[in-house]
C-alpha cells in the first residue's frame, strides 16, 4: 500500500522555520513549592526577557522541577508574547512614557545619543533585548521583577512614532513635528529679534 501524502497535517513540521535570531536574558529565578498530600513538592520559576534587538521584545515565566526546563518554558512563552516598539533612529524612544502594572510604576524618557541605558535590573534587560541604546528610566513602585517588567512593557505599548500619530490624526508627519527654526516666521520673512540694552 502506497504511503499517503501529508496534506496540511503536522502544521509544517518538515518546513524550516524562518524566525529571526532572538537574544534572551534570564531576569530572575525563584525556588517555589507546592504543598501536596505527602508534603511539599519543590520546583523552580524562571523569568526571561526575549528580543531581537531591533524593536521587538517579550517576556515569559516558566515553572518546572529543574532550572533548565523552567528557563526553556519561559523562553518559549516570551517568544509567543512579542510586541513591536517603534524606536527613534533605532536607538531611543520617540517620547517620554509612563507605565504601571499592579504596584509597579515606571517612567521612561528619551535621551540624547551617548547617554546609554540608565535603568536598573529588570528594566535594563528589557531595553537591551529591545535594542534601545539611550534611555533614562526610573522605577517608583514595586521592585518585584515581574511587576517592573509588566509596567515597562505597558509603557512601551503606548510608544508611538510620528508617522503613527499623523495617520491617527489624519495629518502629515511634517504637521506633527515641531519646526526647528530659531526664530518664528512672519509671512515667509524672519521676525526681527529685539535686543535689550
Curated annotation (Swiss-Prot):
GO terms for biological process: translation. It holds the Pfam family Ribosomal_S5_C. Residues 22-85 form the S5 DRBM domain. Residues 1-17, 172-186 have a biased composition (Basic and acidic residues). InterPro entries: Ribosomal_Su5_D2-typ_SF, Ribosomal_uS5, Ribosomal_uS5_bac-type, Ribosomal_uS5_C, Ribosomal_uS5_N, Ribosomal_uS5_N_CS, Ribsml_uS5_D2-typ_fold_subgr. Residues 1-22, 158-197 are annotated as: Disordered. Keywords: Ribonucleoprotein, Ribosomal protein, RNA-binding, rRNA-binding. It comes from the Bacteria. SUPFAM superfamilies: dsRNA-binding domain-like, Ribosomal protein S5 domain 2-like. PROSITE patterns: RIBOSOMAL_S5, S5_DSRBD. GO terms for molecular function: rRNA binding; structural constituent of ribosome. One of its GO terms (cellular component) is small ribosomal subunit. Part of the 30S ribosomal subunit. Contacts proteins S4 and S8. NCBIfam families: rpsE_bact. Belongs to the universal ribosomal protein uS5 family. With S4 and S12 plays an important role in translational accuracy. Located at the back of the 30S subunit body where it stabilizes the conformation of the head with respect to the body. The N-terminal domain interacts with the head of the 30S subunit; the C-terminal domain interacts with the body and contacts protein S4. The interaction surface between S4 and S5 is involved in control of translational fidelity. This is Small ribosomal subunit protein uS5.
